[in-house]
C-alpha cells in the first residue's frame, strides 16, 4: 500500500508573530498547531521534517493579474517559465489574462489555454475569460454556464492586444451576463465602469488603479454601495509598480525612460503616497502584479507597454513592511486571503486545516539585490527593480503539498499545478 507523503514545518512564525507548525498530508494541510509531535514520524522515508528556524510561514500568494503570453507570444514568456517565476516569488496561484493570440474569447480557446497551462505550469492557475469587441455574448454565456470560468475581463482603454470595447450594447451585454467583470479602465472610463456596475448590479473589479484621482472615484462608489446596501461589490486592485515607481524615477535616466512604461502609466510620487495611505485605511482589496513581460530588446527599441513582476512582488511588499509602511497581516490579506475570496477560489488563500497545502516560507530579514543576487526565472530575463536593495525574500514554495521551490532552485521533478476550482 502506498504511504502518504508527509511534510512537517517546525518552528515557524505566522503574520501575527505567533509560533506555528504545520503538518501536510499529501496535498492537504492536515494539522496546524504551536507544537506538532514528530516522534511518530521520525526515520520514516515518506516524511520530511523541516525546521524553518522561526521564519515566517504564509499561505501562497494568489496573483489574479498576469499575462503569461501563451498561446501565441511565447518568445516573451510561457506557462512553464512564468509559473517558475511565480514559484520563486512565492506565488502559488496565478490568473492569466485573455489578451493572448488567439484571445481567450471563445470556449474552445479557453479550453486550449487551460490544457496548455495544465501541462506546463508548476503552480496552480486560473484563466480570465475575455469580452470581445466582436460581441461574444453567446460564448460568455456558454463559458459561465459550463463553469469553465467565473470572471470576464474587458478592456475599456487601449492596451496590448486588439481587445478594446467601445460599443455600449456589447458592454451592456457583458455586464448583464457576468457575475464579476474585471476592467482595464482609466480616467473617465472608471466612471463608466462604475455606472455599469450600479446599473446592472454585477460585481466590478477595477484593475491596476494608478492614481489618487482614479482611486477616489472607486472609493466613493464603494461607499455609496455600502450606504445603499447594494449587493454588487466593487473591488480595487493596485500593482507594486504603481506603489514603488513613479514618473520621476522613470525620467531619471534613458534606460528607465524605455523600460518603465506600462498601461496605465506611472504617475506622481504623491499618487504613490495616496495608494499607500489607501492600503492602510482598508480601501484596497488586492495587490496584482500585472506581470506583462517583453524582451529587453523590444523595450529598448521602441515604447512597449508592460513589465515583469511576479518574482519581486512579495519581496517589494516585505521591504515596505521592513520600512514600516505596511503590516504583515495586511500583506497576507491583500495578496492571499482577499484574492481567494473575491475570485471564490475553493480551499486556497489561507493557512487552514483541510485547505490545499499552498504554503510559503519567508525570510523577512534577508537582504538582497534584485536582478543581481538571484537568477531570474522569467523568460524575459530582466526586472524593473534591478539593483534595488530589498529586505525580505521567499525561500520555499509548497504547491499542493509539493516543494516546488527551495534553496534558490526550482524542483524540476515536482508535479504540475492544478486548475483552480471555484465556488459554483
Give residue spans per PLM region.
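Metal-associated gating/positioning segment near the N- to mid-region
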Residues: 55-120
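Active-site metal-binding motif and surrounding structural segment of the metallo-beta-lactamase
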Residues: 38-58
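C-terminal cap of metal-dependent C-N hydrolases
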Residues: 356-421
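Histidine-centered catalytic micro-motifs
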Residues: 60-71, 156, 182-185, 289
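His/Asp/Glu-enriched, well-ordered alpha-helical/loop segment
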Residues: 188-192, 198-201, 280-281, 285-287, ...
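N-terminal metal-binding scaffold of metallo-dependent hydrolase/deaminase domains
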Residues: 1-43
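Histidine/acidic residue-rich metal-binding segments in metalloenzymes
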Residues: 138-287
Amino acid at each position: 500500500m502506498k504511504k502518504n507523503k508527509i511534510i512537517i514545518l517546525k518552528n515557524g512564525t505566522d503574520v501575527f508573530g505567533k509560533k506555528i507548525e504545520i503538518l501536510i498530508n499529501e496535498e492537504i494541510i492536515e494539522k496546524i498547531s504551536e507544537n506538532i509531535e514528530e516522534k511518530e514520524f521520525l526515520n520514516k522515508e515518506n516524511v520530511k521534517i523541516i525546521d524553518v528556524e522561526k521564519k515566517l510561514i504564509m499561505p501562497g500568494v494568489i496573483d489574479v493579474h498576469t499575462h503569461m503570453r501563451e498561446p501565441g507570444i511565447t518568445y516573451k514568456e510561457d506557462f512553464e517559465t512564468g509559473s517558475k517565476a511565480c514559484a520563486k516569488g512565492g506565488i502559488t496561484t496565478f490568473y492569466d489574462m485573455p489578451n493572448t493570440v488567439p484571445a481567450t474569447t471563445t470556449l474552445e480557446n479557453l479550453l486550449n489555454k487551460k490544457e496548455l497551462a495544465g501541462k506546463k505550469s508548476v503552480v496552480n492557475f486560473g484563466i480570465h475569460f475575455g469580452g470581445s469587441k466582436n460581441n461574444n455574448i453567446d460564448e460568455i454565456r456558454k463559458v459561465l454556464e459550463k463553469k469553465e470560468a467565473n470572471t470576464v475581463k474587458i478592456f475599456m482603454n487601449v492596451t496590448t492586444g486588439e481587445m478594446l470595447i467601445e460599443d455600449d450594447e456589447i458592454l451592456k451585454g457583458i455586464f448583464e451576463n457576468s457575475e464579476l467583470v474585471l476592467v482595464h479602465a482609466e480616467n473617465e472610463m472608471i466612471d463608466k465602469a462604475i455606472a455599469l456596475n450600479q446599473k446592472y448590479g454585477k460585481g466590478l473589479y477595477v484593475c491596476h488603479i494608478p492614481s489618487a484621482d482614479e482611486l477616489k472615484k472607486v472609493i466613493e462608489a464603494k461607499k455609496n454601495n455600502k450606504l445603499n446596501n447594494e449587493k454588487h461589490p466593487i473591488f480595487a486592485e493596485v500593482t507594486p509598480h504603481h506603489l514603488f515607481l513613479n514618473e520621476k524615477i522613470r525620467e531619471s535616466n534613458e534606460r528607465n525612460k524605455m523600460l518603465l512604461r506600462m498601461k496605465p502609466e506611472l504617475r506622481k510620487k504623491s499618487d504613490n503616497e495616496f495608494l499607500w495611505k489607501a492600503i492602510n485605511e482598508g480601501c484596497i482589496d488586492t495587490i496584482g502584479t500585472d506581470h506583462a513581460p517583453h524582451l529587453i530588446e523590444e523595450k529598448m527599441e521602441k515604447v512597449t507597454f508592460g513589465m515583469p513582476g511576479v518574482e519581486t512582488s512579495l519581496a517589494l511588499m516585505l521591504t515596505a513592511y521592513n520600512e514600516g509602511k505596511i503590516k504583515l497581516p495586511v500583506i497576507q490579506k491583500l495578496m492571499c486571503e482577499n484574492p481567494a475570496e473575491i475570485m471564490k477560489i475553493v480551499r486556497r488563500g489561507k493557512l487552514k486545516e483541510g485547505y490545499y497545502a499552498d504554503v510559503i516560507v519567508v525570510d523577512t530579514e534577508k537582504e538582497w539585490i534584485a536582478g543581481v543576487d538571484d537568477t531570474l526565472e522569467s523568460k524575459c530575463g530582466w526586472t524593473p527593480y534591478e539593483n534595488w536593495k530589498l529586505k525580505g525574500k521567499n525561500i520555499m514554495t509548497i504547491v499542493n503539498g509539493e516543494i516546488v521551490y527551495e534553496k534558490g532552485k526550482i524542483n524540476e521533478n515536482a508535479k504540475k499545478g492544478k486548475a483552480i476550482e471555484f465556488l459554483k
